[in-house]
C-alpha cells in the first residue's frame, strides 16, 4: 500500500512503546489536513498500524 493511498483516507497511527507486548500508547485517527498542521509528531516518527496488525514505517 502506497503512502498516497493513506493520504486519501483516515490514518491510524500507533506510537512506538519500549515494551512491544503492550498496545500502542496512542491510537489516533487523522485526516490528511490534520497531519500537515504540525500539531502531531511527524509521520517519520510514527508507525502505521495496518488492518491486519502488521506495521509499516514510512521514513
Swiss-Prot record:
Record key words, sorted: Mitochondrion, Plasmid
Any one GO cellular component localisation term in the record: mitochondrion
Main localization, broad class: mitochondrion
Cellular location(s): Mitochondrion
Protein's name in the database: Uncharacterized mitochondrial protein ORF4A/ORF4B
Organism annotation: Ascobolus immersus
